[in-house]
């Protein structure tokens, strides 16, 4: 059993229940946007159900890998490929947003004054909060790498400290991003600039929140002795995801904040 290449799992109700929760969320979202009665309630029920199913599903995955020994070396290879493909799919999302941004900025139409940024848009100074957030996020990338080296060296204390620093920096980044949104002189409704800016940076912020939860769970698991030198796939996946968030932010800073606001 130790070397078999098959990802054997117990029968689980969570995939079916997740699809039902996603259906409720989608239906409720459409009803809410069209002001139908009960749309908001249905959306809330669907979202809460989806979050609960995600929690219990990942709980079962942790049990299978940590306590039941289902995650053999060949299975871990498959899980790594799956995580890499997932990260690639996320990068394709951002590729679409950058495409929309450059399509609009490299050849601005007459409707926005044939200039970029569009006339009437007061852009953000890239050397204030955006640059500070860049430093914070790059520092968090360094601290998560520190945690990886600590786990590989068997230094659990350093791993816990470095992961706690990563979570703290991620929360600070999110707080500054929220402050930037509150003080921004334009909204998502302000034409193509506002829509592309908030879509790209907001989607990245959503990924930061997901990554923060991911790393916080890894911190909790490290405290519970779930990770060892040779078996810490959950942490590796979180670290890869966080580095993807770092790299995407660098492109956002250079392309949208610096070049796009010049």
UniProtKB/Swiss-Prot annotation:
The reaction(s) this protein catalyses: 4 Fe(II)-[cytochrome c] + O2 + 8 H(+)(in) = 4 Fe(III)-[cytochrome c] + 2 H2O + 4 H(+)(out)
Source species of the chain: Prototheca wickerhamii
GO cellular component terms given for this protein: mitochondrial inner membrane
Keyword Translocase appears in the UniProt entry: yes
Broad EC category: translocase
Top-rank taxon: Eukaryota
GO molecular function: cytochrome-c oxidase activity
Alphabetical UniProt keywords: Membrane, Mitochondrion, Mitochondrion inner membrane, Translocase, Transmembrane, Transmembrane helix
Transmembrane feature ranges: 13-33, 38-58, 82-102, 134-154, 159-179, 200-220, 237-257
One Gene Ontology biological process: mitochondrial electron transport, cytochrome c to oxygen
PROSITE patterns assigned to the protein according to its UniProt record, in alphabetical order: COX3
Family to which this protein belongs: Belongs to the cytochrome c oxidase subunit 3 family.
Name of the protein: Cytochrome c oxidase subunit 3
Enzyme Commission code(s) on record: 7.1.1.9
Stored Pfam families: COX3 (PF00510)
Lineage of the species this protein comes from: Eukaryota, Viridiplantae, Chlorophyta, core chlorophytes, Trebouxiophyceae
């Amino acid at each position: 059993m130790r070397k078999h290449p098959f990802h054997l799992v117990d029968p689980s109700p969570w995939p079916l229940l997740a699809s039902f929760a996603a259906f409720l969320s989608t239906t409720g979202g459409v009803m809410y946007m069209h002001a139908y009665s009960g749309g908001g309630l249905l959306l809330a029920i669907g979202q809460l159900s989806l979050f609960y199913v995600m929690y219990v599903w990942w709980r079962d995955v942790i049990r299978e890998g940590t306590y039941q020994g289902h995650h053999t070396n060949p299975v871990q290879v498959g899980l790594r490929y799956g995580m890499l493909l997932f990260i690639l799919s996320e990068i394709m999302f951002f590729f679409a947003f950058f495409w929309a941004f450059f399509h609009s900025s490299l050849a601005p139409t007459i409707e926005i004054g044939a200039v970029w940024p569009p006339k009437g848009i007061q852009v953000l100074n890239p050397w204030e909060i955006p640059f500070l957030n860049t430093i914070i996020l790059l520092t968090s990338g360094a601290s998560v790498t520190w945690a990886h080296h600590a786990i590989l060296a068997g230094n659990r204390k350093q791993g816990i400290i470095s992961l706690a620093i990563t979570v703290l920096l991620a929360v600070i980044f999110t707080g500054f991003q929220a402050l930037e949104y509150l003080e921004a002189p334009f909204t998502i409704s302000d034409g193509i600039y506002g829509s592309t800016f908030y879509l790209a940076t907001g989607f990245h912020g959503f990924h930061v929140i997901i990554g923060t939860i991911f790393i916080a769970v890894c911190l909790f698991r490290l405290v519970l002795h779930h990770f060892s030198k040779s078996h810490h796939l959950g942490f590796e996946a979180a670290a890869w995801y966080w580095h993807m968030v770092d790299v995407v932010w660098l492109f956002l800073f250079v392309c949208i904040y610096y070049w796009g606001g010049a």
